[in-house]
Amino acid sequence: MRTVPALLFAIASTASAQGAAADASGGSRRAKVPFGVGERMEFEVRFGRLKVGNAHMEVVALESLRGRTAWHTAFWVQGGNFLYRVNDVYESWIDAETLSSLRFVQELEEGGKNTTRKFEIYPERAVFIQTNKKDPKEEKSVPNPLDDGSFLYFIRTIPLEVGQTYDFDRYFRPDRNPVRIKVLRKERITVPAGRFNAIVIQPVIKTKGIFSENGHAEIWLSDDDRHIILQLKSRLSFGSLNLFLKRYYPSPNP
């Protein structure tokens, strides 16, 4: 189950989508996105054929952070067995205008061990600070940075063309770049939430786990303007780790 957190290390993009919608709480402009506050995706987590837990992704709120309007998103993973339990939360704050990461928080409970990491990210200076370190200091980042959770929301805003491979340098920790995305095919699939037309991508990043260069993982997105995450399947040396969408709740205020 140690590979579960790697589910979020999926994807990035080269450019920020700009939109004309005015922010409800101020005068800043928001990028056009296919999600809104209250959107929620619920998943069944399986290891092979065995159900081991649940996960969900949610757009929690539209908040003000350091004078910027930001989408607050969260990803929860809960499950395991009597030998190993996981209760992880990943929270991202994404600039609503530029779709760059402003803050990223990980709270991990895995196998009885608790880990917390908190990052303040400054796109305007291309630096980040891990604030929960004993001696926090500025570290080099990249322009228009994205974190683990914001990758999954950002990829939903851009078109994907079958047969193309995209290399991106937008992960906020430069040593993890580039992220490579292969757009493999389109197909129709059935998940607990229903039957969908899907576009399939394969992410590869410089890390260990399910998205490593030596591994193989695929993500199915709905083949429409929303790019809802429908399922994820991975093949590991000791089995397969999979997520399947079981319920989708659109934003009441898209």
Regions found by a protein language model. Name each.
Residues 19-123, 157-254:
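Acidic, serine/threonine-rich low-complexity disordered tracts
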Residues 5-9, 48, 144, 150:
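Intrinsic-disorder/low-complexity peptide segments enriched for small residues
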Residues 10-12, 149, 163, 171:
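Low-complexity, intrinsically disordered/propeptide-like segments
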Residues 113-157:
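Hydrophobic, well-structured mid-protein blocks that either form specific transmembrane helices
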Residues 1-17:
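Sec-dependent N-terminal signal peptides of Gram-negative exported proteins
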